Design a protein with these regions (language model features):
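Cap/lid segment of the alpha/beta-hydrolase catalytic domain
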Residues: 62-71, 78, 88-112, 226-228
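Short beta-strand/loop motif that positions the catalytic acidic residue
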Residues: 184-186, 190
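Alpha/beta-hydrolase fold nucleophile elbow
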Residues: 129-139
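N-terminal cap/lid segment of alpha/beta-hydrolase-fold proteins
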Residues: 24-50
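C-terminal catalytic histidine-bearing segment of alpha/beta-hydrolase fold enzymes
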Residues: 208-258
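Short glycine-enriched nucleophile-adjacent loop
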Residues: 144-155
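Short beta-strand element of the alpha/beta-hydrolase
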Residues: 51-60
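Alpha/beta-hydrolase active-site loop
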Residues: 106-127
Length: 258
């Protein structure tokens, strides 16, 4: 975990249904510090005595700063109902928000975002409500690139990764040999992150004999699981992906509640 800061500079060359009511402390805003500056986070705390397994959620590139997101909030709430301390890190806290059409800025900011995530994981290490040995990443698009990068750099801190339509930056492929278990979820008609990146990750993890699963959704585009993006949303694929995600988390975080 401590090694994230040391190698994040390498990333400068690296080319994102739920219950109606919840039995936990709901979407709570907080912050931690990274490099002496604040980073906004939101968390949902499950009922019962901890320490709990935890899931760190990372948004995609389209997230706006300080805007919240009801769909991420729903996911956070459902995961808390399943017994996970769930934290949503707003990693744009120290940079401007960027979009898919800004690759140069994205490349420059990537190490900053990764350092923020590093600091967030450090804060979870010290949180008495969290079991630091059972922490997973749940990433979407750009958030998946960050999740996989964190897993490649320091797999000992991360027990599992669920990645929706992302990939592993080529500069970090060396980390595949010790990557934690990964669930790959991708649409074969993705116009933003080509499905070839999912297949490349699958081949790399297979070569390194790392545990992983992959599901490619036929006809699905990018962000197929977000109702707010109606043009790409597919309810059946979204539900299937969420079911696979929660089963994968339960299996790899040894969550006895589900």
């Amino acid at each position: 975990m401590r090694s994230l800061k040391a190698v994040s500079g390498a990333l400068a060359g690296a080319t994102f249904l739920l219950a109606a009511s919840y039995a936990h402390a709901g979407w709570v805003k907080g912050e931690f510090t990274s490099g002496g500056k604040p980073v906004t986070e939101y968390h949902c705390v499950p009922k019962g005595n901890g320490p709990h397994p935890a899931v760190v959620m990372l948004h995609g590139a389209s997230q706006r700063k300080d805007s919240g997101n009801p769909e991420y909030e729903k996911m956070c709430s459902e995961l808390a109902d399943l017994g996970y301390y769930t934290e949503f890190i707003e990693y744009y806290s120290q940079t401007d928000a960027v979009g898919p059409g800004e690759p140069v800025q994205m490349k420059e900011d990537f190490p900053i975002w990764l350092a923020e995530i590093h600091s967030g994981l450090d804060a979870l290490d010290k949180n008495p409500a969290v079991d630091p040995h059972r922490v997973a990443m749940l990433g979407f698009s750009l958030g998946s690139f960050l999740s996989l990068s964190a897993g490649a750099i320091d797999p000992n801190q991360i027990a599992a990764i669920v990645e929706y339509y992302g990939g592993l930056p080529p500069t970090l492929e060396f980390g595949a040999k010790s990557m934690p278990p990964v669930l790959i979820l991708h649409g074969d008609k993705d116009v933003l992150v080509p499905v070839a990146m999912a297949h490349q990750l699958d081949e790399l993890l297979t070569k390194e004999k790392r545990p992983h699963e992959m599901k490619i959704y036929e006809g699905a585009n990018h962000a197929f699981n977000f109702p707010g993006l109606a043009i790409w949303y597919n309810a059946d694929d979204a539900q299937d992906a969420w079911t696979r995600s929660t089963k994968f988390l339960a299996a790899n975080l040894n969550n006895p509640s589900k």
